[in-house]
A protein has these predicted regions:
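Amphipathic, Lys/Arg-enriched alpha-helical "gate/interface" segment within cytosolic domains
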Residues: 2-122
Length: 122
């Protein structure tokens, strides 16, 4: 499940990801991406992974499609979690995203927000 975080503002959007993501989750989040891209052009994302279990099969394909569709508009992505495989997921995301991708331990949530708001190159 995706849950938009209230700290989101402007072109910096954060989501809590919990459980196993479904096709319905991706259908629900699409309008959020499109609205932010329409308003700002480029977006910066923060994924807060809490008890994240991965993707159902269709949702894994949706994830790939979203990176293809919206990747050019994603300026950078902060991934916050506490598992080694989540760090590897961040490294894999760098292959699909021209902007910055950085992994933060869950104890570094405020640092992740600051990095996203400031910009990877600043």
């Amino acid at each position: 499940m995706f849950e938009k975080l209230e700290e989101s503002s402007g072109n910096v959007i954060g989501f809590r990801l919990t459980g196993k993501l479904t096709d319905a989750d991706y259908k629900a989040i699409g309008p959020e991406f499109e609205k932010a891209i329409e308003n700002s052009g480029k977006i910066r994302l923060l994924w807060l992974l809490e008890d994240f279990k991965g993707w159902e099969a269709k949702a894994a394909w949706d994830d790939y499609e979203y990176w293809r569709k919206y990747g050019k508009n994603m300026e950078q992505v902060a991934i916050v979690g506490n598992k080694r495989w989540e760090d590897w997921m961040a490294k894999l995301a760098k292959l699909f995203l021209k902007g910055g991708v950085k992994y933060f331990d869950d104890s570094q949530l405020e640092d992740a927000w600051a990095w996203d708001r400031k910009g990877a190159s600043e």
